[in-house]
Amino acid sequence: MQSAAIAGGDMVIKPVNVIGGGLAGAEAAWQLAERGIPVKLWEMRPQIKTAVHRSENLAELVCSNSLKSNLADTAQGLLKNEMEKIGSLLLACARATQVPAGSALAVDRERFSALVTRRLQAHSRIEIIREEMTSIPGEGVSIIATGPLTSEKMFQEIAALGGDDNLYFYDAIAPSVTFNSLNQNKIFKASRYGKGSDDYYNCPLNREEYEKFWQELTAADIVEGHSIDQKDFFSGCMPVELIARRGLDTLRFGPMRPVGLTDPRTNQRAWAILQLRQENHEGTVFGMVGFQTRLRWKEQDRIFRMIPGLEAAEFIRYGVMHRNTYINSPRLLLPTLQNKNHPALFFAGQITGVEGYMESAATGILAGLNAARFVAGQELLVLSPLTMIGALVHFITSAAAEHFQPMNANFGILPALEQKIKDKKSRYQHYVERSQKEMCKISELFLEHVVKEF
C-alpha cells in the first residue's frame, strides 16, 4: 500500500481514510490534517442510524457527559495532561463547553459535539463523507475508528483480518432526568469529600428505603433480546441491576456509596445515596451517576421513582443497552496501533479494547500521529509505558490474547516504581511525576518530527 507518489518533482499526497467520526476518529483526523495530510473522514450517520446516538454530530457522547477526573494526582487527570501536551482537539473543545462537576471534567454534550464538528468541518484538509464504509480500503493508509457500534458489514471485514467475531460485550447507558421534576426538599448539593464545588445533587436513602428499592430492582423486568452473561459487560458500564444481584450491599459499596457525603440538613451520612450530575450548560438535565441499566422503560419509571427526590422525575432519556464490539488487539496490533499484517492500516478507539472517552481519544491521537509519520516515511512512535497513554497502548497490545478484556486508564497498568511507597497518595504522585518527565521527552520528539508541509 502506498500513500504518496512523486509526480513532476512534487509529492502528491493521497488522503488518509479515517473510518468513524467518533472521539478517536475525530482526534485522528485532526492530528493528520494539522500535519499537512489530507483526510477523508467517513461517518455513517445519519445515513445509518444507531440505537443510542441522538444527533448527526461527530464525537457525540452517548453514555455520560463526564470525562472523569481533572485532578492532577489521578490516572484520568494524568491522561488529560498527556493529551494536552500532544495537542488534543477534544480536550480543547471540552474545556470550552464544560459544565460544573466538582473535580471532574463534564461537558454540555450537545455543545461539545457541535463544536468538534464545526472545527473539523472548517479544516481545509478534512473532507467529511456521510456514508457507510462497508469495506477496508485496499490502497493507501487507513485508520479504523468505528467505535463500539461498528456496523455489521465493517465488523465482518475486520474479523476477516484475523479477529474473532465473538469478541464483544455490552454497554448500558444511564437515564437522564429534568431538574425541575426533582423534589428539592429531599435532595442536597455536595461533592464527595468536598472536592471541587457542590456540583452534584444527592438523593439520600435510609436503610428501609434502600432495602425496598434493592428488592424491587433485583426482581425487575429487563430487556433481554440477546444471550447475555455478566462477563459480557465491562465493569465500568455494568448495569445497576446486575450489580444489585450480587448482594444486598453491593450498591452501597458501588454507585450508591454514601462515603464522603454528609447531608447538611441532618449532619449525618445516609445509608445510601444516588448522585445526579449536570449534563448540559443550562443545568436543566441531570444524569443518574452509575445507573446504567437494561430495565424496561416502564420499570425504570416505577423503580427509580422510589428514590427520594425522584418521585415525580421526568425521564428525558431512559437507560438502554447496546452491543460494544472490539478486536483482539494483542493478536492484531503493534504498539504503533498498526495491524501486524497490514502496516498501512491503523486502529483507534474503543474497537481496540480501550474503555472510556478520553482513552479512546488518546488512541486516536497516537494513530493519527503515526499515520502521518507513515505517510512521510518517518519512524513511527512507540510511547513509553511510563506514560499513561503508553501504558494503555502497551496493555492492549501485549495482554494475554486468550483472555483479553477492555482496559481504562489507571495507575495499575503503569510499571512499578523503583522504590516501594506504601502511602497511596504519595505513590500516585510519584507515578504522575515520572510520567510527566517521560512525556516531556516524547513531546520534544513530536516537535522534532512534526510534518507541516510537503
Language-model-detected regions and their locations in the chain:
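A glycine-rich dinucleotide-binding beta-alpha-beta segment and adjacent secondary-structure elements
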Residues: 288-354, 361-363, 381-398, 404-408, ...
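N-terminal FAD cofactor-binding segment of flavoenzymes
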Residues: 30-91, 385-393
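Internal hydrophobic alpha-helix adjacent to the cofactor/substrate pocket in enzyme cavities
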Residues: 361-381
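Predominantly flavin-linked oxidoreductase catalytic cores and closely associated redox partners
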Residues: 122-297, 301-302
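Redox-cofactor binding/interface segments in oxidoreductases and associated redox assembly factors
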Residues: 19, 143-145, 347
